Amino acid sequence: MAILQLKNLNKTFSPKVIPVKDISLSVEDSEFLTLLGPSGCGKSTTLRMIAGLEEVTRGKIFLGTEDITYKRAGDRNMAMVFQSYALYPHMTVRENLASGLKLKKVPSGEIQTRVTEVAELLGLEDLFQRKPGQLSGGQRQRVAVGRALVRKAEAYLLDEPLSNLDALLRERVRADIKQIFAAQKAPVVYVTHDQTEAMTLSSQVAVLNNGYVQQLAPPADIYNHPANLFVAGFVGSPQMNLLTIPCKGNSAMLGDFSITLPKFSSSPPQIVLGIRPEHVRVALPEDTQTVKGRVYLVENLGMYKLVSVRVASSQTEPPTLRALLPPDQNWDNEEITLALPSENIHWFDVESGDVFQ
């Protein structure tokens, strides 16, 4: 197998439309890289350039030592799974699995062997004689994945393959994809806007916005150590609390309460405090960094209640904190004291949005 590399990749449709800006990535053998971001961030355009379906404006794409930047899509030895499944409606499952190999004139005996192996892996043997219209969404998705696997490609590309499935089925197929591609020993590039897919499937996540890679790191690092405000706000559900607050000496003021700042090289007039709702908890007597406020909204999530609190403040518009709290208490309209542990607080620059240092 081979390493997939993107070097300073750019795509320009017009002077004002530049969806991909100077992206450099490397995907090792057996590595599962997810391109994660909102609509219009450049993730699908990047995938299409890797596949050869979109022309590169500037930059290079390597598969192993070979420069494939301008190589025809059909000659790249990559396999792609599309959002729309792209199955032939007039063909049976067996014929769909074999179709790509027949076009490449693979010997019939080898086609039979590969199709049988993949069908056993994906549990498709009993569906061989059915056509796509006779399959469920999950079954069609497995056939689409199977069409990619029979190729025995040097790299696999998946473009939002679960977006057409309902939530329960998406969870099951997600687990299948993780197991299946872990066994392929090839680079995998997966595109999604769904952070749950990105966090559960990936060995590396590249968070994209406005054509740029905002952060490239393992999922745990993306979640626990976001590089900037965009990553902090985009990854995580419920969303991280992000509050722009004034600084006073070595402290920041959250409402009427003082939050100790780390030892920064400079003291800004304002700073953005970030803390995830699961890290905000009911204060204990020994907690030293606390804020008080009143609950104004409670959302029951089953295992937790998402509680929104207006922090006590002399300001006209008091800041709001959200906390994930135990479900066995009625928090409605309660006065509450919350602890904000220093080790769970992130600080961001107001101007650049980057982590403040």
Predicted regions and their residues:
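ABC ATPase nucleotide-binding domain
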Residues: Q5, S26, F62, T337-A339
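Pre-Walker A (P-loop) beta-loop-beta motif of ABC nucleotide-binding domains
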Residues: I23-T34
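The feature captures the beta-strand-to-loop junction immediately N-terminal to the Walker
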Residues: L36-P38
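Conserved ABC transporter NBD signature motif
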Residues: G59-D67
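ABC ATPase nucleotide-binding domains
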Residues: K71-F230
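Non-catalytic connector elements of ABC transporters
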Residues: P238, N250-Q357
